[in-house]
Each structure stands twice: as structure tokens, then as C-alpha cells.
């Protein structure tokens, strides 16, 4: 909130692994009310966490920049399914429930 009050940022970068989904949505609402642009980023997340971020971005539609890199070591990925990535786009399956991930 201090960032918004002091006007010291043009963008806020939201990362679900640092805030969680509900807090990310709160941050987005505060930023939008102050006309601060939003971007979403990630760290080394599983398909499940990445799927949550992709769904949030698609559902909210308020992000100017999206930096959601796929898992860099697919052999260590604990989940199957989730959003399909074909640079620079993610595709969500209309046929799978929820995030669309299952445990390997």
C-alpha cells in the first residue's frame, strides 16, 4: 500500500509463490484503483502453480505484461497436464476440470 500511496512505482510485479492467489487478487485490485500497471511473473514453479497463474491472468484480464516461463526441467515436473505452452502463448483446455493438472 505504501507503494501506491507514495506513487513510487509504474508497475507492480505479482508472483503467486510470494503472495498466494487471494493476496495477488487484492494487490491487483489496489494497483488497478491507483492506475498502476500490473505484470505477473513466476519462479521455478510446477505446472500446477503455473496453471494457477495462467488461470488468474486469463480470468482477471488486467495484466500488461506476462512473464510465465514453463518449468525448465520437465523431467523433474511432478504434474502432468495443465496449460499447454507454445511460445508466446498458453492454451487452457476446456475439457479438463480445475487447473487441469494431475499428479504423475
For each feature predicted by the language model, list its residue ranges.
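Flexible C-terminal active-site loop/helix
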Residues: 6, 43-104
